From Swiss-Prot:
It catalyses: 4-amino-4-deoxy-alpha-L-arabinopyranosyl di-trans,octa-cis-undecaprenyl phosphate + lipid IVA = lipid IIA + di-trans,octa-cis-undecaprenyl phosphate. InterPro entries: ArnT_tfrase, Glyco_trans_39/83, LipidA_mod_glycosyltrf_83. It comes from Pseudomonas fluorescens (strain Pf0-1). GO terms for biological process: lipid A biosynthetic process; lipopolysaccharide biosynthetic process; protein O-linked glycosylation; response to iron(III) ion. Its EC number is 2.4.2.43. The gene is arnT1. Pathway: Lipopolysaccharide metabolism; 4-amino-4-deoxy-beta-L-arabinose-lipid A biosynthesis. This is Undecaprenyl phosphate-alpha-4-amino-4-deoxy-L-arabinose arabinosyl transferase 1. It is an enzyme of class 2 (transferase). It is a multi-pass membrane protein. The chain crosses the membrane at residues 27-47, 98-120, 129-149, 151-171, 194-214, 225-245, 275-295, 311-331, 334-354, 366-386, 396-416, 420-440. Belongs to the glycosyltransferase 83 family. The lineage of its organism: Bacteria, Pseudomonadati, Pseudomonadota, Gammaproteobacteria, Pseudomonadales.
Length: 569
């Protein structure tokens, strides 16, 4: 009898299989609501990602153009359409607010947690492993942190996860009908992944399934049933693929070469260029607060690699990680699709330790996390005493920061004291962190990284203006989102809108330092003018000096808001 099927009951976290089956799913749902959903409205939109994706999706609702993405009315072809659809649907249902912008990321992560639970049940049919794997995945630092952040990575990760779960269900089923269902589901996931972030959604399932099926000597089955996935993927994605080509013939050329070829093969000139080993230390950080369990988990994976399900999980983890490491362009969130198999492997490892009543590695994990948080607490006390990073008016935010750090220490200390009965307590620590830390940010970070909060305080005055101007894409998109007005002209900045601004029709949207005086004169003839500037450099200070001196001026940190009244000729 294997240890995972051992009927031995002991006073671990899961006192009985029946209790796990009864409480695991309600407990995961409760944690999802408390740590993922409730904090969504507790802090402003981070720049540049959240304001960008919130504005692009809102613009779909305002313009009715659900085919070609536009950023503040300017062509923006760096991503396909489906991710914007989901964020737009969130805003359509819940309103143009923080919850509406972020709900797509939270729900995508929640579904990925559910997929973890389902696949664990399929692999081992052990309620304790099911619950442990889902809890671990839900509490990985990178996964939990992105769940409340409005970008496309949680959505893309969902579609990759669904693809790989569908492949396993397809190849593990005995009946042709069930296999067809699995391959068809793979096609749906690939089609949605393609429309969320591109051709990587098609590559990753092939990268994993092909060597696995060759190893299993089932290549013919892969070819026969794989055609079903190809057809379904085409049915899902082809209508939009053709529609965007018809409306914007240059979309696929730009998207393919800029977002795929350049990122993978451009070397040091690639966007977000990083060394090949970038993801190795990041993998450790991404799995906090469970990072010290990672070596033992991977060692067990290697020892059991000849077992079919372990080999599949190993390929799912290792091959995408190797592919992303070879790519020239790298961002931390790219490895999110690698983490679900890690959670499954780690969940099985933890339950085996509990069955064997071996808490050594769990205790070491708690010690590491406790020391880490203790260092963070000392650093916070020192910085507050010497630098006063929180002002006297920010005691509530400072209190939240202390709650986060002390809560992390207590949660992990409990794991140290009772590693078998309270092994899951680090999940509570990471839950407190992702729920409270964004709201605990000092004002200097809020003012710098969440400009929509300051803009919201002056929203009435800004909404009464006829023209808008900004020197920063993050501030401009926050302004456009808050006012529901995509038309924000760009003062001495281009950034990621370089491609869209090359359109001759967009020439009027670019305002140079030499031309801002004339632009202001013409704009004030039409009505009041609102200007939002971020001032971090000497050049940006010069931009402020070029503005008229007769306007209202509001300042918070490096963010400046000017309101200029209409001026008749």
């Amino acid at each position: 009898m294997t240890s995972e099927n051992n009927p031995l009951r002991h006073t671990a976290l899961f006192p009985s299989t029946t209790a796990v089956e009864r409480w695991a799913i309600p407990g995961l749902i409760l944690a999802f609501v408390m740590f993922y959903l409730l904090p969504l409205m507790s802090h402003g939109l981070w720049i540049p990602d959240e304001t960008r994706y919130g504005q692009i999706s809102q613009e779909m609702l305002l313009s009715g153009n659900w085919v070609a993405p536009h950023f503040m009315g300017i062509r923006y072809f760096e991503k396909p359409i489906a991710g914007y659809w989901m964020i737009a649907i969130g805003q359509a249902i819940f309103g143009d607010n923080l919850f509406g912008v972020r709900i797509a990321s939270a729900l995508s992560t929640g579904v990925s947690v559910w997929l973890t639970y389902l696949l664990a049940r399929r692999l081992w049919n052990n309620p304790r492993i099911n619950a442990a794997s889902a809890l671990l995945y839900m509490s990985f630092g990178l996964i939990a942190g992105q769940a409340g952040y409005a970008n496309l990575d949680p959505q893309f990760t969902l579609w990759v996860n669904l693809s790989m779960v569908a492949v396993w269900f397809a190849i593990d089923n005995r009946t042709p009908r069930a296999r067809l269902g699995g391959w068809a589901l793979l096609g749906v996931a690939c089609g949605m992944g393609l429309m969320t972030k591109g051709f990587l959604a098609l590559l990753l399932p092939v990268l994993i399934a092909l060597p696995y099926m060759l190893w299993q000597r089932r290549f013919g089955e892969l070819v026969r049933y794989g055609l079903v996935a190809v057809v379904v993927c085409a049915l899902v994605s082809l209508p939009w693929v053709l529609a965007v080509h018809y409306r914007e013939p240059d979309f696929w050329r730009f998207f393919f070469w800029h977002e795929h070829i350049r990122r993978f093969a451009a070397g040091d000139d690639a966007q977000h260029a990083r060394p090949w080993w970038f993801y190795l230390p990041l993998l450790f950080a991404s799995t906090l607060p469970w990072a010290l369990l990672l070596p033992s988990t991977l060692l067990r994976m290697w020892r059991e690699k000849r077992e079919a399900k372990m080999a599949y999980l190993a390929l799912w983890f290792l091959l995408p990680l190797a592919f992303f490491s070879l790519s020239s362009g790298k961002l931390p969130t790219y490895i999110m699709p690698c983490l679900l198999p890690v959670a499954l492997l780690m969940g099985q490892t933890v339950v085996k330790w509990l069955d064997q009543r071996s808490g050594r590695f769990l205790r070491l994990n708690g010690v590491f996390n406790t020391v880490l948080a203790s260092v963070a607490l000392v650093a916070l006390l020192y910085l507050q005493a010497t630098k006063e990073i929180y002002e006297n008016t920010e005691m509530f935010s400072l209190s939240l920061a202390y709650i986060v750090v002390v809560g992390w220490i207590i949660a992990n200390a409990l794991q140290v004291l009772r590693p078998l009965t309270l092994w899951a307590m680090p999940a509570l620590g990471i839950g407190l962190l992702v729920a409270l830390l964004p709201a605990a940010m000092p004002a200097q970070i809020v003012n710098s990284k969440m400009p929509d909060q300051f803009i919201a305080e002056h929203q009435r005055e800004l909404s009464e203006t006829a023209s808008l101007l900004s020197n920063d894409l993050g501030a401009a998109s926050a302004l456009a989102w808050r006012l529901k007005r995509p038309q924000v002209d760009l003062f001495n900045t281009i950034g990621e809108l370089k491609y869209g601004l090359e359109d001759p029709a967009m020439e009027a949207r670019k305002v140079t330092m030499d031309g801002v005086g004339q632009w202001m004169t013409e704009a004030r003839k039409k009505g009041a003018v609102g200007v939002v500037l971020r001032v971090n450099s000497t050049q940006e200070e010069q931009e402020v000096e070029l503005l008229p001196v007769d306007g209202k001026h509001y300042r918070r940190g490096n963010l400046h808001i000017f309101i200029f009244a209409q001026k008749q000729p």
